[in-house]
Amino acid sequence: MQFVLSWVFLVGILKGVQCEVQLVESGGGLVQPRGSLRLSCAASGFTVSSNEMSWIRQAPGKGLEWVSSISGGSTYYADSRKGRFTISRDNSKNTLYLQMNNLRAEGTAVYYCARY
């Protein structure tokens, strides 16, 4: 059985500022159960390292669910993701990552990166 991890891109405009904030995600796809994927979220218009960044997901027919966050040197995970998911960032590329290992069919969802 295979399942799909989808991705989208989110675009936001800062109110009253002529600066576009953009998050462009990539890396989703079809994967076998127990397989691995790495999602990427390239940011522009702000600095990833200066903000709390998170990954959230939405499974089919379900609401939004927090997955993981990174702030400064600290990382946080939903209990169900600990040990399987790793959030990280590359400051030189201004990019956020989510490494997902030992994926399960119930992991099928749209994954979003978000800035807080």
UniProtKB/Swiss-Prot annotation:
Chief location category: secreted
SMART domains: IGv
Record-linked InterPro entries: Ig-like_dom (IPR007110), Ig-like_dom_sf (IPR036179), Ig-like_fold (IPR013783), Ig_V-set (IPR013106), IgHV (IPR050199)
Positions of the UniProt region annotated as Framework-2: 53-69
Record's keyword annotation contains Membrane: yes
Alphabetized UniProt keyword annotations: Adaptive immunity, Cell membrane, Disulfide bond, Immunity, Immunoglobulin, Immunoglobulin domain, Membrane, Secreted, Signal
UniProt region (Complementarity-determining-2), positions on chain: 70-75
GO cellular component terms, A-Z: extracellular region; immunoglobulin complex; plasma membrane
Recorded superkingdom: Eukaryota
Start and end residues of each stretch annotated as Complementarity-determining-1: 45-52
Subcellular localization(s) per the UniProt record: Secreted; Cell membrane
Region (Framework-3): 76-113
Annotated region (Complementarity-determining-3), positions in chain: 114-116
Domain Ig-like stretches: 36-116
Entries under PANTHER family matching the protein: IMMUNOGLOBULIN HEAVY CHAIN (PTHR23266)
Subunit: Immunoglobulins are composed of two identical heavy chains and two identical light chains; disulfide-linked.
Function (record text): Probable non-functional open reading frame (ORF) of V region of the variable domain of immunoglobulin heavy chains. Non-functional ORF generally cannot participate in the synthesis of a productive immunoglobulin chain due to altered V-(D)-J or switch recombination and/or splicing site (at mRNA level) and/or conserved amino acid change (protein level). Immunoglobulins, also known as antibodies, are membrane-bound or secreted glycoproteins produced by B lymphocytes.
Entry protein name: Probable non-functional immunoglobulin heavy variable 3-38
Organism: Homo sapiens
